[in-house]
Amino acid sequence: TAHFCLLNLVMINEHFERIVKEKFGFDFSPTQQAAMQSFLTFLFGRHPESLFLLKGYAGTGKTSLVAAIVNTLLQFEQQVVLLAPTGRAAKVFAGYSHQPAFTIHKKIYRQKNAQEGIGIFSLGFNGNANTLFFVDEASMISMGSQDSNFGSGSLLDDLIEFVYNGRNNRLVLIGDTAQLPPIGVDVSPALEAEFLRVSYGMEIYEANLTDIMRQSEQSGILYNATRVREMIGAGPLAKLLFRVTGFPDIVRVSGGELLEELDQCYNSFGMDETMVICRSNKRANRFNEGIRARILYREEAFGGGDKIMVVKNNYFWGAEYDKIDFIANGDIATVEKVGKYKDLYGFHFVHARLSIYGYEEEISAWVMLDTLTSEQTALSYD
């Protein structure tokens, strides 16, 4: 009987891996193959409180491998839940996995009743059982009490408690150690295997993707990202130099050519696929004003079709909607309709109808226009 069970498990492993490879679409690199074997050991292991940690640099095929694994699990009728720390990260996760994804906060927290304090959230009940929870961009998961309105104040503690409170649930953390850790720490605690093992008593399975995929080798963006990562690992940076020639995905343009180049990108690829990255909010405001006036020909500061990002958790405007506990910092909203304007206490507001990524219903809210031109990440209390 033991030999039969062992043989059966080997056959299941091989079958599962074969389907993942078909969905992946390429031959596995050595580190991808090692990651696949480690995941299979985790998946079919018997340890009830085990966790899988998948780390990988840009261009190593991490997202493609995760997407293939997730969709293979679904084909095997295994329950999965996809999560990410921010609304934008959840949108990206959903995009490459072709499955719904949610923010961690919206999945694990529930608002307390009015007597206990408006805007105070406790850890919710986990109704999932026999489920694998995949969390992308895990480097952003903090342990500090940055927002005491949520649970214990430690997102990592609450996430692990929530997942393993459900029967036979397990967690897969996905991230890149080269990305910035949470504010106030030098490393990302959610990506440190030894820390997870000691702090939570978990059985940790770990894989690290380091091989750059062949189809990514000609990418100038990945070349420079790898170069910067190697420079950081070598010690303090004396001077940061980028190589911008000889790559199909990098075009160097002067300031005088930028508007024309942006206009062409908007027409060819769409606004969602065209972004300007700035070093400060001050410069972002200048680019925003120039693009709106000279490319989009939008005279108003705020109008229908605009995309805005929420910069502070809001517990008020979602209260009247059944499926919206709160509107989270980092959520992306599209302005569907603009209503009346109002000035109050020296600030400028507009009433708007908004659709927020991840929710089916639109909401009505007053939007503070001053944040659109603020040079800070959010308005200060002053």
Language-model features: locations:
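ASCE P-loop NTPase helicase motor core
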Residues: 36-37, 41, 46-237
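Conserved phosphate-coordination/catalytic loops
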Residues: 26-33, 146-154, 252-257
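Long, low-complexity, intrinsically disordered N-terminal extensions of eukaryotic proteins, enriched
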Residues: 11, 32, 79-81, 246-254
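Conserved pre-motif I regulatory segment
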Residues: 16-50
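Conserved helicase motor core of P-loop NTPases
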Residues: 3, 15-16, 39-40, 47, ...
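Short, Lys/Arg-enriched N-terminal segments with co-localized hydrophobic residues
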Residues: 1-10
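Conserved SAM-binding loop
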Residues: 28, 82, 276
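Short, conserved phosphate/pyrophosphate- and ester-handling motifs at nucleotide-, phospho-/glycolipid
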Residues: 32, 86, 280
